[in-house]
A protein has these predicted regions:
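Internal intein/HINT superfamily modules and their associated LAGLIDADG
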Residues: 1-150
Length: 150
């Protein structure tokens, strides 16, 4: 099944929000850009891999608490370029924007083609896009308290 353009746009908005909640923009010892998401549910990672078109999923791993998790990782140049196209100008949080800037800078030192400039545009989420649902899927929780009337 092919994604229609509107549905695909929503999926990318969701992915950016999810990545801002659970993603990690890193550089390794070889000065390469690497993007990682760790998740207990591997099915989410497979959906992300299909959406992006790049990456590897490894695991299961066990953390210090004994919980099992899986890892989505993109470290090759083609996959990194694709992620840059998705994230550049679409991030919301200052902390992820700063990490992304370094990620982009390192990528630009790796390629011999024209550098990709950092977009000055910033995404402002609304209730009509899917960034917030992605971020909540990564970081959110809801709770309620039922109290008896006095």
């Amino acid at each position: 099944m092919k994604l229609n353009k509107l549905n695909q746009k929503h999926q990318f908005e969701w992915f950016v929000g999810f990545a801002e909640g659970d993603g990690s923009w890193q550089t390794d010892n070889s000065n390469r850009s690497i993007f990682i998401i760790n998740q207990q549910n591997p099915q989410i990672l497979y959906k992300i891999k299909k959406l992006v078109g790049y990456g590897q999923i490894n695991g299961p791993y066990e953390n210090k608490n004994g919980s099992t998790y899986y890892r989505y990782r993109v470290g090759n140049l083609k996959g990194t370029k694709r992620l840059i196209e998705i994230f550049n100008g679409n991030l919301v949080l200052d902390k992820t924007q700063k990490r992304f800037e370094n990620y982009l800078k390192v990528y630009n030192t790796q390629v011999s083609t024209k550098e990709i400039p950092l977009s000055e545009k910033r995404h402002i989420p609304t209730l009509n896009d899917h960034w917030l649902s992605g971020f909540i899927d990564a970081e959110g929780s809801f709770s309620g308290i039922i109290q008896k009337d006095p």
